[in-house]
């Protein structure tokens, strides 16, 4: 576990590759969906207290997002009781089905735990970013989801032109763009298949132009590994008769408006009556 001196140890990383010829390392964010290169002499090993504090802050942010979600759901069920005159226990719920493609198996595992705690219907697949455009069509046919997530790692590559528009200055955005385009050939309707695409510092505008409903990263900032989960939860639990409140949706993420954004989109939640006793 390391941090970068030049960035004030703002993010902690794992070293995933070392190039002894160039004295550089490839780093993966512990909590952020970022892949970065760094000089070996810029790396610092944090002490145990720093690591503990970093992990605690991240865990608290995650727990707060989950608490907000459950408070919102509780309020929505009470509203249902007052409108229908029936107890929420008489209904059954069918949130939208999610297909989550992730370029990192560790992040995927953490996301699946979060989905489970939020009682979401999800299929998770580890698919490297380069392979997502190749595999997305087959996986969509196989699983028939209501919501698709395309994520993993990404990074903006600094350049002399300070060019934020060319996809060549992003590590993986072009693969996410291609995958979104393939998914839109499978299902063109943005309300029929809801798509979130991107990771840290991804090309937000290009992803939306390709057909994503939601994407990262408007301000080219880092996003948390669980941000896609918290974002699509709101879509999965918003009625098919309503548009998702974008401000409410983004409020439930860890990163907020700087990291994720998107378009007005209809929800994927269906309510059923009566609930079977069996």
Q: What is each PLM-predicted segment?
A:
Residues 96-105:
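Conserved acidic segment of CheY-like receiver
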Residues 219-278:
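C-terminal functional extensions of proteins
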Residues 112-123:
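Short helix-loop-beta junction
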Residues 32-80:
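Intrinsically disordered, low-complexity, charged/polar segments
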Residues 15, 24-34, 38:
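SH3/SH3-like beta-barrel fold
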Residues 176-223:
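Catalytic cores of nucleophile-dependent amide-cleaving enzymes
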Residues 9-19:
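Short beta-strand-centered aromatic/proline hotspots
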Residues 140-153, 212:
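Proline-aspartate-enriched helix->loop->beta-strand connector
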């Amino acid at each position: 576990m390391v941090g970068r001196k030049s960035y004030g140890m703002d993010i902690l990383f794992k070293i995933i590759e070392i190039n002894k010829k160039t004295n550089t390392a490839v780093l993966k964010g512990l909590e952020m969906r970022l892949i970065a290169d760094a000089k070996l002499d810029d790396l610092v090993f944090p002490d145990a207290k720093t690591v503990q504090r970093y992990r605690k802050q991240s865990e608290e942010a995650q727990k707060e997002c989950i608490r907000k979600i459950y408070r919102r759901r509780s309020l929505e069920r009470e509203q249902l009781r007052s409108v229908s005159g029936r107890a929420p226990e008489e209904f059954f719920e069918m949130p939208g089905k999610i297909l989550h493609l992730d370029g990192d198996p560790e992040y995927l595992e953490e996301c699946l735990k979060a989905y489970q705690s939020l009682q979401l219907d999800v299929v998770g697949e580890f698919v490297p970013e380069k392979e997502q455009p190749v595999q997305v069509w087959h996986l969509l046919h196989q699983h028939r989801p209501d919501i698709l997530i395309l994520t993993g790692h990404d990074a903006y590559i600094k350049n002399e032109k300070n060019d934020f528009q060319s996809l060549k200055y992003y590590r993986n955005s072009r693969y996410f763009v291609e995958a979104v385009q393939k998914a839109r050939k499978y299902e063109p309707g943005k309300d029929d298949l809801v798509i979130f695409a991107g990771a840290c510092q991804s090309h937000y505008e290009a992803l939306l132009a390709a057909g994503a409903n939601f994407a990262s990263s408007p301000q080219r900032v880092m996003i948390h590994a669980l941000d896609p989960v918290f974002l699509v939860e709101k879509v999965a639990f918003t009625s098919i008769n309503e548009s998702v409140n974008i401000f409410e949706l983004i409020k439930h993420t860890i990163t907020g408006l700087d990291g994720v954004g998107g378009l007005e989109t209809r929800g994927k939640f269906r309510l059923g009556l009566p609930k079977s006793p069996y």
